[in-house]
Every structure is written in structure tokens, then in C-alpha cells.
Amino acid sequence: MLAVSNEIKIVIGSWGSFNECNERAYGSKWLDLADYSDWDEIEEELKAEGFELDGMDEELFIQDVDNFPSGAANWDYVNPQEFFELLQEADVLDDPGKYDVMMAFIEVRGYNEFKDRVDKYGSRWDDDIRLYKN
């Protein structure tokens, strides 16, 4: 199902806290990725929430995702920093039109092909894709 908003949000967890079943085992608060200009800001947020990024919490994963196809990837194995930087490079966090194209593309072609296109073409990943709406 297509989302109605390009406000992609994630919950970031760490394998260390998850395995320890400590207070961070359920991950961060919901992070709206459009609210952050770079990964350093997200790291600061995680540290403010008590994550020990140079210790127990150095191995991060995506625990939950909103406004993105949840079945598009095995989120346990997607690095949150790489995901954030991919979405930034694709311009989908700032451009609702690109977001709509991405959602349709992933529904038809899959997350890995989307990632490959962004890796190859950067923000011009969608230059040859046309999305026609009713």
C-alpha cells in the first residue's frame, strides 16, 4: 500500500541493547528522517536517548519503518546510516514527487533495484521514469 506522506520515519535499535534486553532494547523514538540534515545529527539524538554508540550500541539496525514499504527489505540487515544517506541522495525526503516515484518503483521493481539506481545515478535516479496518476 502506498503511503500518503513522504515523512519517512524509522526506529533505530542496537544489537547490543537488544541482546541485553536493557532499556534501549525497543530502540529509539520514531525519527522523522526529514528532520535531520546529516547522520551526525541522528547520532546526537541517539546519544541523547542514552545510546552508547562507541560501546554496547555501536551495531545499529532498523527496528521499524513508517511511510516506506515495510516488506521492501529485511530491516535487521539494513544499516540505518546507509538507508538515511541513500534517501538523502535520492532526494525523496525533500521532494514529494520523487517520493511518489520511489514508492511506485519499489512496489514494482524492489528496494535493491532502487538502491542500485541511486548508487549509479545519484539524485537523477528517476530521470527516465514516468509516473502517471489518476
What kind of region is each of these model predictions?
Residues 1-134:
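Acidic interaction surfaces
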